[in-house]
Amino acid sequence: MQDEYYMARALKLAQRGRFTTHPNPNVGCVIVKDGEIVGEGYHQRAGEPHAEVHALRMAGEKAKGATAYVTLEPCSHHGRTPPCCDALIAAGVARVVAAMQDPNPQVAGRGLYRLQQAGIDVSHGLMMSEAEQLNKGFLKRMRTGFPYIQLKLGASLDGRTAMASGESQWITSPQARRDVQRQRAQSHAILTSSATVLADDPALTVRWSELDEQTQALYPQQNLRQPIRIVIDSQNRVMPEHRIVQQPGETWFARTQEDSSEWPETVRTLLIPEHKGHLDLVVLMMQLGKQQINSIWVEAGPTLAGALLQAGLVDELIVYIAPKLLGSDAHGLCTLPGLEKLADAPQFKFKEIRHVGPDVCLHLVGA
């Protein structure tokens, strides 16, 4: 039970990095000697010291003969920082307990093997499912090459997202919108469509002042990182004057053809081929994976939402339901053309249902 206690502490530490570590995984480390925590730390930002290094610095000489609990296999390769395996070996750690192996091909068991070769007692698999939940995006990208996609939808009780006139602000509550801010902050990128940009002119930024107090305490304003904003714009309809381009951070456009407009340096273009007359979403996701995008939060209209669902690209559905009815003339939740049989319907299963102010948030994953 002691091992579980210390690993749970390491997992809790790892969660603190979930806003800032992209494209790296979230990792926590706790060093224990004679039943006392002598060092702990978590990975805070890509390019900065890993969790093990922070914990070893805190432990100092007490690390010798101690047990290190780490939520992911210690790295064994030279990247932007030196290998954590070398640091653990040099510190004289006697035992390493890892929650899981690292699927990164540059590590993939080599770290644990190196520790064993140095005479360290090594085990892995403790609280592995919890560790995997912590790094869903990183793990999916490493295993498949694709980012982890969360599709956010907001609707009325009768599944409507806007009035017939297009009016949609606001169907859901201020509490739900604060929850969306937290979800944005945890995501590596936010995806939308040119139709949404033209209709709503959104900023699609993380607004620190709108985060809940608990998130603000974990995520100081000076550390604020804006997710990459990605716009699917196959007809080059978005202009440099739109708000999404004017915000801090990067904006990427997925296009099927070059655009001749003058864009700020923070704008990038990804040229993606067409498939059946539309931008190929599968190729786009492959390209984003190659760009080291771990997780994508989608905020878009019914057309893009439906296209992602029909392409089988959605890993999670996050649906905010407001306790109001908009009527049959209002706009529907998503467009799924050609769907005629129940057997062909995209299937999900409920993972969590929670109250968010007066609304309900449905959290679903692929069946």
Where are these regions (language model features)?
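Flexible, gly/pro- and Lys/Arg-enriched active-site loops
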Residues: 310-348
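Residue-level signal for inorganic ion chemistry
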Residues: 10, 28, 75, 115, ...
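Short beta-strand scaffold segments in enzyme catalytic cores
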Residues: 27-35, 153-154, 362
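Zn2+-dependent cytidine deaminase-like catalytic core
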Residues: 31-130, 309
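Active-site ligand-binding patch in enzyme domains
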Residues: 140, 150-157, 161-294, 303-306
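Short, basic/aromatic recognition patches
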Residues: 2-22, 141
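Conserved histidine-centered catalytic loops in small-molecule metabolism enzymes
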Residues: 337-367
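Short gly/pro/ser/thr-enriched loop/turn and capping motifs at secondary-structure boundaries
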Residues: 103-106, 129-130, 198, 237-239, ...
